[in-house]
Amino acid sequence: MIPLKTIEDLISKHSILEKELSSGEVDKKLFAEKSKEYSDLNEVIDDARKYFSYEGEKKDLEKILSDSNSDNEFKEMAEVELKDLKLENETIEKKLKLFLLPKDEADKKNAIIEIRAGTGGLEASLFAADLFKMYEKVSHQKKWELELISMSQSEAGGLKEVIASIRGKNIYSTLKYESGVHRVQRVPDTETQGRVHTSAATVAVLPEAEEVDIKINDSDLRIDVFRAGGPGGQSVNTTDSAVRITHIPTGLSVSQQDQKSQHKNKAKGMLILRSRLYELERSRIEGERSEDRKSKIGTGDRSERIRTYNFPQGRVTDHRINLTLHKLEAFLEGEAFDEMVENLTLQAQEEKLSNLN
């Protein structure tokens, strides 16, 4: 049960914001923030008022049921109404609890997605390319903006590594559950005996950090420049346009050479480094929470096997929630992606509610 004082404060806050915004006297610097807060409260204010009045309505109906002077027909009506009221209140309570859960500010951010071929040689790099194509299709369907940051190709159209930024609305909240090891089971084109091979690729999804999110001192950076190299060490640029940025305190290092301009390579390298440092700090804070409150979903552990794509059986299985979708082709086309994300989000919310209780 949610303390009524909490609900009362929520209703009061809505009323105060409503008066402030309608008065036209709100500080311009705070107007957008207060408008957003008011808009968020608007989504649950009716439910909050119903929840606040629930106990009184319930007592009135229980009084009718216990009154020996009430006729049977009236009691039957009160009994049905009480049952409906309790069911409605349970739904409202769950919605309000979700609203009151601590918000992850990173959910609203854009994302950096990094995909790397894992065990499995050529087949792993081909699978990494398949995953990248899937995220490209999802981005296109949702009208997100996907920008390639760097790409390292292998033979036969595979990818050793690819890094991209994805921009749009609530990107990180949608993609954050993709971090981990993705495993594929299929018969490679080169397999003459028809045997199923298993290979893997790792996916890391980071919230795209802005300069205000994390402070990086220039003195903590070592920047090396060198000539960009092509396949087999072949020089593709006669100027020192490639950049390697090392964050000395953590040892994190980012190399960027996809652009012809040293300035652009440095800017993209800093974007990746900033996002990795931001995620490192988020992970440190998360690690300070007690073990029993850590979520099994969305931990972002890159070594955790999260999903298997089985081509012979046409299925994709997410091991964190034991969900299997027998629509592998549609999933890789981005068409069944939302179904998986919705189930992961629901389970993560259930875990948070359980911890709240």
From Swiss-Prot:
Modified sites of kind N5-methylglutamine: 234
Compartment(s): Cytoplasm
Renumbered residue ranges of the record's region Disordered: 284-304
Organism domain of life: Bacteria
Family matches, as InterPro entries: PCRF, Pep_chain_release_fac_I, Pep_chain_release_fac_I_sf, Prokaryotic/Mito_RF, RF-1
Alphabetically ordered keywords of this record: Cytoplasm, Methylation, Protein biosynthesis
Modification after translation (UniProt): Methylated by PrmC. Methylation increases the termination efficiency of RF1.
PROSITE patterns: RF_PROK_I (PS00745)
Chief location: cytoplasm
A molecular function GO annotation: translation release factor activity, codon specific
Coiled coil: none
A cellular component term, taken from the record's GO annotations: cytoplasm
Described purpose of this protein according to its UniProt entry: Peptide chain release factor 1 directs the termination of translation in response to the peptide chain termination codons UAG and UAA.
Similarity field: Belongs to the prokaryotic/mitochondrial release factor family.
Protein name stated in the entry: Peptide chain release factor 1
Organism phylogeny: Bacteria, Pseudomonadati, Pseudomonadota, Alphaproteobacteria, Candidatus Pelagibacterales
